[in-house]
Amino acid sequence: VIGEGLDRYMPLIASKGVRQTPWSEGQAVRQLEPMGFIKFDILGLATLRMMEETIERILQRHHSVESPTFEDIKKYYDENLHPDVINLNDKEVYKNIFQAGKWMGIFQFTEKGAQSLAKRAQPKSIIDLSAITSIYRPGPLSAGVDKAYVDAVNEPLTVKYENEIVEEITRETSGFLIFQEQIALLANRLGKDISLDDANLLRKLLTKKGLDPAKQAKKEEILHKFVAGCIEKGISKRAAEDMWQKFEYFSGYGFNKSHAVAYSMISYQTAWLATYYNAEWACAFLDKEPESRKEAAINIAKSWGYTIKPLNINTSGRRWTSSNKSTLVAPLTTIKGLGDAAIDEIIEKRPFMSVEDLLFNKGVVARKLNKKSLDALTRASAMEDLMDERF
């Protein structure tokens, strides 16, 4: 992202009508940063659509807003869910979702392993959530960090800190180096004349293998400063070197704290919606889950105490709805072979009092609600209420 035309500073090529640069920026190759450019990875999250739909449903049901606009949805978000206003220490949210092990599309907690870790660790804060999601990755899991972390959380008196500075920086993660920023802060606070810039450089150097001679020399220089600073602060040389070894060890899977907290904020927001607007969240969850996971999603909804009402030509809509606090109504869109035109025709012309009313209704356009559509409705048992004993 720059303030002037890209073609002035880098080569551009056309690929399928889209302008692209052949330059790369990633773990292995960095061609943009040396030239002073910043690359932004902008990723979409299906969870944000679920949140948007949930807020839309909340506005419709609880605030009498018939057709919420994007501005209406954003206003609700800003007043209720924005990080600056939401209560991040709501015990009900942690108790109802993360501690109780109840999951329904909760961001970052859709896998059983993450759910199990959260239930064992009993998170009580955003930092706790951030630590759990940072640990739940292949590197930390293979090293058994999850088990050691849970033990430390449940038995805090067993955690030993080298000194007050170490405790101050690692207390929030029960003595574990989980975030990359913790390594940088410890180097800065414990080392002798290690600037924040050098501490941040160390964070980067520790994650790289096969350093060139200049970078290796810089790393060793920081090591000597770190050990010297620790000794001045009453930490033995051996303890300082052991701590450095922890830096080396944990840097292999340390996670960026700002990234972890930002993602955990979304996890908490989804948990808040699931706690206080459960039916609206459940409907949005079922709407957004792909067909390949729909059956599992319905079972999750049932485990939350919901009854799934059968498909009904007169009451089912275009998306999942809740008829009351304990009943969810499946939409017509879940019927295989029933197209959008047929669904639109049904919703516009209903209610239908009987099969005859449906078949011989002069207002129904036959080419929209055709034989194929009627067959699909029958197979899905969506017309049971229209049947009498003759059928």
Report each predicted region and the residues it spans.
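Noncatalytic, beta-rich nucleic-acid-contacting surfaces in large DNA/RNA-processing enzymes
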Residues: 1-391
